[in-house]
Amino acid sequence: MTREDSIRQIENYPPFNEQEEKDKALILGWISNNENAFSRENTVAHITASAWVVNKDRSKVLMVYHNIYNSWSWLGGHADGETDLLSVAIREVKEEAGISNVRPVSEEIFSLESLTVDGHVKKGNYVSSHLHLNITYLLEADSEEQVSVKADENSCLLYTSDAADD
């Protein structure tokens, strides 16, 4: 998928609510005004891709306890120059959860959001506060497949039907 294809996919995404409407405009504006929007070399804001991973019968979602944010989250990460954001989301799930059998429920965008990232230390270097302009896809995985922690990014992964209870 080219940069133009990604822009078109975002343009065609129907916002679910006012937050998504505003974030969609922000994301499209940022991409059009920043050649390096898909790279974390842009230290103000950059495109990220995430996955809302459900099991086969759609009764559970895979959540990760993120080390930097100290909170439960869905899986995802930096585009790092890649413009095929669905591929980025799939790659991040495989890397962060250690699973190989993951597939898109749909190739369309599931949600989009602008996420604030507080300043933090990563690999011994300070990273200033910035924005993740995030595109999320709905993926499916086999909840029987063993998940594994990626220690430099997360400390726990689990399938849950109610993340608030865990």
Annotate the PLM regions:
Residues 39-71:
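A glycine-rich, hydrophobic loop/mini-helix early in the fold
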Residues 15-50:
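Acidic, metal-coordinating catalytic segment for phosphate/diphosphate chemistry
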Residues 59-100:
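Conserved Nudix-box catalytic region and its N-terminal flanking loop in Nudix hydrolases
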Residues 137, 159-166:
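Conserved small/polar residues in nucleotide/adenosyl-binding loops
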Residues 98-145:
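Active-site segment of metal-dependent pyrophosphate-handling enzymes
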Residues 1-23:
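Predominantly extracellular/luminal regions of secreted and cell-surface proteins
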Residues 53, 138-140, 158:
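Short, well-ordered beta-strand micro-motif
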Residues 145-161:
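C-terminal/domain-terminus segments
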